[in-house]
Amino acid sequence: MKLTVLVGGVGGARFLLGAQRLLGLGQFATPDDNARHELTAVVNIGDDAWIHGLRICPDLDTCMYTLGGGVDPQRGWGHRDETWHAKEELARYGVQPDWFQLGDRDLATHLVRTQMLRAGYPLAQITTALCDRWQPGATLLPVSNDRCETHVVVTDPTDQQQRAIHFQEWWVRYRAELPTHSFVFIGTETASATTEVTAAIADADVVMLAPSNPVVSIGAILAVPGIRAALRATRAPIIGYSPIIAGKPVRGMADACLSVIGVDTTAEAVGRHYGARAATGVLDYWLVAEGDQAEIDSVTVRSIPLLMSDPEATAQMVRAGLELAGVTV
């Protein structure tokens, strides 16, 4: 089976780990299972930024480190056994920004990526090269080789004027607490999805939307030209998972993002935001948490346990989605 999943960072990486657990891939691989299934992740690049002259791709790296067995288990991002000497030395020099953490081991990834970008390699090819070191057991594809950054229009606290700041500054520095007016996906007017991404969607037996942030992760992927058309054209069933349980995001600040675009923080509202593929949206099936309800025209909804407490629990989420769509592993 070919499974293609649209993902963000920490939550998306954990969802992929559960898919690997179910399919027997990556660190859960067996010789028989490894030949029968393929897992491809279409990864958000809206969080990508230039920091200290280096190109940072947080969601790609989180997926790569998690599936490769090297992620910090407490934070859910960055390197295991990380040290922070470079960050401390930069602070002594007074270098800005001082609110974004880059660990010493993590810097190696960003140095390699930046060198390859400056040598003319596209991001997809660079990601493949980085994955050669980590062996994630899945194909990780940036949604585009082009610049597609999420920026946020806020009220500047210094002069009360509206201005756009990078998503990382809004999310990490200000913790989404500034008066916020809109999200802008910079570069999408000229960007396009890679041919590898559209092929992964077209050739899939099943497509899933991970329970990642519906605005700045999945939403940023959907904003890239070519993605919605590919999803609407694929013959594969499209199964989405709610990131909202009992009116609250499982992690992160999805509620802050949803309020900016006028969507309620409920499983039903997020499902309606994605919409039915039978109309103008992208969903065929929608999984919500036990105790939550959702009615979405032309979308089949089921309630299941949705907490990704460990790979086995997440594997059962993936299995439930496949069963709902009538797909047998």
Curated annotation (Swiss-Prot):
Catalytic activity: enolpyruvoyl-2-diphospho-5'-guanosine + 7,8-didemethyl-8-hydroxy-5-deazariboflavin = dehydro coenzyme F420-0 + GMP + H(+)
Catalytic activity, EC: 2.7.8.28
Domain of life where this protein originates: Bacteria
Assigned keywords, A-Z: Magnesium, Transferase
Cofactor entry: Mg(2+)
Gene Ontology BP, a term: F420-0 metabolic process
CDD domains associated with the record: CofD_like
Biological pathway: Cofactor biosynthesis; coenzyme F420 biosynthesis
InterPro entries: CofD, CofD-like_dom_sf, FbiA/CofD
GO MF assignments: LPPG:FO 2-phospho-L-lactate transferase activity; magnesium ion binding
Keyword Ion transport belongs to the record: no
EC class (word): transferase
Entry binding sites for 7,8-didemethyl-8-hydroxy-5-deazariboflavin: D61
Coiled-coil ranges from the UniProt annotation: none
UniProt record similarity statement: Belongs to the CofD family.
Record HAMAP family: CofD
UniProt subunit comment: Homodimer.
Its job: Catalyzes the transfer of the phosphoenolpyruvate moiety from enoylpyruvoyl-2-diphospho-5'-guanosine (EPPG) to 7,8-didemethyl-8-hydroxy-5-deazariboflavin (FO) with the formation of dehydro coenzyme F420-0 and GMP.
Listed name of the protein: Phosphoenolpyruvate transferase
Source species: Mycobacterium marinum (strain ATCC BAA-535 / M)
Phylogenetic lineage: Bacteria, Bacillati, Actinomycetota, Actinomycetes, Mycobacteriales
Gene that specifies this protein: fbiA
